[in-house]
Amino acid sequence: MTLSLEQLSARMRQGEDIPLSDTARIALALSIPSILEQLVVTAMEYIDAAMVGHIGAEATAAIGIVSSSTWLLHGILVGLYTAFSIQIAQYLGADRRQDARGVLRQSMLFNLILGLGAAAFGVGISRFLPGWLGADISLQADASAYFAIWSAALPFTMAMGMYTAMLRATGDALTPSLISVLVCALDVVFNFFLINPTRQIQLFGQSVTVWGAGLEVPGAALGTALSTTIGGLLALGVLLLRDGPLCIRKPGSWRITSACLRNLWRVGTPLAAERAALSSAQVLLVRIVSGLGTVAIAANSLGVSAEGLCYMAGYGIQDASIALIGQAVGAHRRDMAKRFAWLCTMMGIGIMALSGMGLWLFAPALMGIFTADAAVIALGAQVLRIEAFAEPMFGASIVASGAMQGAGDSTGCFVLNLFSMWGVRLTLAFLLAPRLGLVGVWAAMCIELCIRGALFLIRLARGKWLDKGALQ
C-alpha cells in the first residue's frame, strides 16, 4: 500500500527510516498524474497549434512572434507564486498547518494585486510589442491582438497555476491534473468555434452547418483565455470548499506577515529573476529567428510546441520533486531530501531519454500535425532531430532544479540557468544563425541544454543546495 504524503511526513518527523521501496512508490504516485497531465496538456496544445497552423504560416508566425513575451511575463509570475507553494510544502512537512493556511490566504491577496497589475501591463504594451520584436508589418495586428487577449486573462491563469501547485504541495496530484485536462479540452472546443468561420462539416454521412466566429488568431487567444479563466475559478473553488491541512474555512488571519514576505523574497525573487532571465533570452532568440524569414519563424514556433511532448514529462516529475523535497526539508530530514532528489532526477532522465528517441523517429510526423506547409515541416523536423539528443540532460536540469527549489535553493538555480542560457545558448545562436540559419539556433540550444544538465547534476552531487535549510 502506497503511503500518502501526509503519512510520509509524519514518519519523517518521527525520525523513522523509510524503506526505498516506499519512497519510490510515493514518488511515482505523485509523478504519474502530473506526467499524464502534462502529456494531455501537450496533446491539446498540439491540437491548438494545428488549428492555427492550418490557417496558414503567417498565423503561426504571428503567435510565434509574441510567444516568448508570454513566456517572459507568465514566467515571472510563476517564479513568484512558486515560492508560496514551496512555503506550504515545508510548513506541512514541519506540521505547521496554521502557518501553511496563513500563506494560502496571503497568496490569494498576492494573486489579486499582481495578477491585475500584470494584466494591465500586458494589455498596455500589446499594441507596440510586435514592432519592438521586429515582426513584419503583415503579422503585427494579429500578434498584438493575441497578446492583449492573453494578457487580460492573467489573473485567472495565475490563479490556476498557483492553487494547483498548492494542492500538489499537500500530496494531491490528481485534482490539479483533472483541472488541467479539463482546461485543455475546453480550449480545443472554444478554438473550434472561435477560430473557424461558420461552415459545413460531414457528420455520420450528413452535411451539418456548424457556427463559427471566424476570428482566426484572436479566436485562439480568446479560447485560451476563457478556458484558463474556468480553470482558475475551479482551482480556487477546490481550495475554498475542501477540508484538510489547507482548509481555509478554519479561523485565521488574512494579515500579510513579515515571515511570508521574507520567504517570498528569499525564494521567490531568485525564481522570478531566473524566469525573467530565461524568458528574456527567449525573446532575444525570437528576435534572431525573426530575421530568418516566415518559414523559419513558423518552424521554430511549431518545433517548440512539438518538443513539448518530450520535456513536459520532466516538468510533471519536477512538480512531484518540489512537494516531496519541500516536505522532507520541513521535517528536517536531509537524508530523505537527497534520496528524493536523486530518485526523481533519475526518473526524469530516463523518461526524457525515451521521449527523445521518439522525437527523433517521428519528427516529420509531429510537424505534419501542425501544418501542411512542406517547407515548414522539413525545417521543423530537421531542428527537432538535433534537439532530441539533448533531452536526457534537459530532463536532469528540469528535475534537479525542482529538487533545489523545494529545498529553498532558488538562488543556485538562477545562477546556473543564467550562465547556461546567456553565456552559452545566446552566444552560440548569435554566432551560428547567420551561417546555419534556424539549424544553427537549435544546435546552440542542444549544446546549451547538455551543459546545463551537467551543471545541475554536479551541484546536486555536491549537496550544497541543502545548506539553505528550512524556511522561516
Question: What does each model-identified segment do?
Answer:
Residues 39-61, 130-137, 193-198, 207-215, ...:
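Helix-terminus/linker motif at the lipid-water interface of multi-pass membrane proteins
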Residues 180-187, 305-308, 418-427:
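Small-residue-enriched core segments of transmembrane alpha-helices in multipass membrane transport
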Residues 1-34, 88-155, 186, 202-269, ...:
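Short alpha-helical transmembrane segments in multi-pass integral membrane proteins
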Residues 60-120, 157-176, 286, 299-357, ...:
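Small-residue-rich hydrophobic transmembrane alpha-helices
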Residues 46-50, 128, 162-166, 188-193, ...:
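Alpha-helical transmembrane segments of multipass membrane proteins
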Residues 29-48, 149, 160, 227-231, ...:
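Transmembrane helical elements of multi-pass membrane transporters/channels
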Residues 18-50, 54-55, 68-87, 112-119, ...:
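N-terminal transmembrane alpha-helices
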Residues 400-437, 443:
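C-terminal structured "cap/appendage" subdomains that terminate the fold
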